Each structure stands twice: as C-alpha cells, then as structure tokens.
Design a protein with these regions (language model features):
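PLP-dependent amino-acid enzyme catalytic core
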Residues: 1-297
C-alpha cells in the first residue's frame, strides 16, 4: 500500500468504521462464543479464555474482513466482479462473501494448491484459476486481472475495510468479557492483529494487546525493531497461516502504534498446543491459531 493511502486510512473515524463493520457482518459472520480453558488457566496461573474462530463460517476469521470489504463496494463495482489470490482461508472467505453479495468471484491459486482447498473454494461458487508455481505468481496474475478487466481486488490483509472486519473480533471480546485485561493474537500479514488492536485500543485503551509469532517467521520482530516494514529473507514454520515474509504496510502502521508486546514461540510449543486443544477442548486448531496459545507458556 502506498504511504499516502496508509496516512489516509489512519485519519478515518475508527470507532464509526468498526461499528459499521459489525453491523454489516450481522447475519453473515458468527459471533463466536468465549470458551474458558481450565487447563491453560491452571498452567499459567491466570484466567484464560479462548475465542475459537476456527468455528467461524468457512472455518476461519477471514470471512469477517472479506465480507466487510465486499459489503463496502458499490453495485457498479460489484458488477465488475471480485478477484483475489490465496491458497488458504482468505480464498474461501472471499468466495463466500462474494456469493452472499451476489458477486462473481475469481480466486487465483498456485498450481500446487491441494485439491481439497480448490474444491472447498469452488463449493462457495467461485471460479478458481490455477496459475504459477508459488503464491507470488498467483497474486501477480490476480492483480493483472484486476487491471485488465476492471475487477475489484480484495487484499488478504493490507486494506482498511478488511482490517476493520477482523477488528469485530475485538469488539466481541470487549462485549463478552468487559473485565478483559490482555488479548493475545497471532501476527501473519497483520490484518487480524491490526484489526483486534485497533478495536481494543479505540474502545478500551487500557487493555494490553500482545502479538505472537513463530521463531521461524521474524518479519514482525525485525520490522517493529526497525520502525518500518522489514521483510524476512527466509520463513521456516509449520504455521503456514502466519508464514509471511512481508507484513502489510497499513497493518504495520497500526500494530506499531497499538501493540504492547511481542512474544516469539517455538515450533515445539505450537505443536504441543495443537494437541492440547484437541485433547482438552476437542478443538481442531491450525498451527497459526496455536501460535497465540503457545505465547501463554
């Protein structure tokens, strides 16, 4: 995102935009419940509550940002169609959101994308284009389609409406747990972390927001230390959902302002938390979500 667009986004009425996002999402995204975790509470000596977005529509929080973005578009824009690039949760979030809005969606995916993910995306009515060997090539093709055919590109994280959509998680936390003191969130591209931090700090700034990253994905640690986006040369982690080399420009600006602390976790801790959630809570949690749980140890 260009710097002028970042500055413009930072000047918007965050409280009003977050409330608007919540209103748009009513009837589409689930208000996921808060679940107490006795085992984590005993381990840490603090009351630990979980917000399982893996139980969200399409299986992840991504529907929130995707739908808020698409709901913000005019009918004329919708008529041109929606396009994005993703090999994971964002693809299904955009496909579902576009279907709800009555828009045609085209999702560009790498040719190596597992058939299960391709089929899951198609099931929501999207056209899937398999292009390129890696995600960057798919993303470049999606951008080309947007330019040539006038389609609207829905970014996975570097977009204000997407961020506000993810921020509705923070609003729900404040509503359901009015005495909350700390919120831990995993950082990948930064849309989720930026949205939650924006919501929490806008409405209850005394609450601490803590980011969590795998030790093999250092972009956020390096960027926050440098005071600017500092892409990682290599990313090695099982948590593919947060395995991002280049954090988003707008997410960085928001997280740099609002994040209280950053915790790095090991692959062993991530894997242990995946098993713990399955054994104690009967929740199937992907590695990216387990990153925030690992930060509690």
């Amino acid at each position: 995102m260009e710097q002028k667009d970042v500055l413009k986004a930072l000047q918007r009425d965050h409280a009003a935009e977050l409330k608007l996002a919540a209103e748009r999402l009513k009837g589409t995204a689930r208000h996921t419940e808060i679940i107490p975790s006795p085992v984590l509470s005993e381990m840490t000596g603090h009351e630990i509550l979980l917000k399982p977005e893996n139980l969200q529509v399409t299986g992840s929080f991504k529907i929130r940002g995707a739908y808020n973005k698409i709901a913000s578009l005019t009918e004329e824009q919708i008529a041109h169609g929606i396009v994005t690039a993703s090999a994971g949760n964002h693809a299904q979030g955009v496909a579902y959101a576009a279907r709800e809005r009555g828009a045609k969606a085209t999702i560009c995916m790498p040719q190596i994308t597992p058939p299960l993910k391709v089929d899951a995306t198609k099931a929501y009515g999207a056209d899937v284009v398999l292009y390129g060997d890696v995600f960057d090539e798919s993303a470049a093709h999606a951008a080309e389609l947007a330019d040539k055919e006038g389609m609207i590109y829905v970014p996975p994280f570097d977009d204000y409406e997407v961020i506000c959509g993810q921020g509705t998680i923070g609003l729900e936390i404040l509503e359901d747990v009015p005495n909350v003191t700390d919120v831990v969130v995993p950082l990948g591209g930064g849309g989720l972390g930026a949205g939650v931090a924006l919501a929490i700090k806008t409405f209850k700034p005394e609450v601490r927001v803590i980011g969590a990253i795998p030790e093999g994905s250092p972009a956020w640690k390096d960027s926050l230390a440098a005071g600017r986006v500092s892409p990682a040369d290599h990313v090695v982690t099982s948590a593919e959902g947060v395995a991002v080399k280049h954090p988003g420009d707008l997410p960085f600006a928001l997280i740099n302002e609002f994040l209280d602390d950053l915790v790095t976790v090991t692959e062993r801790d991530i894997n242990e938390m995946i098993l713990l959630m399955l054994e104690k809570h009967k929740l199937v949690v992907e590695a990216a979500g387990a990153v925030s749980l690992a930060a509690l140890e």
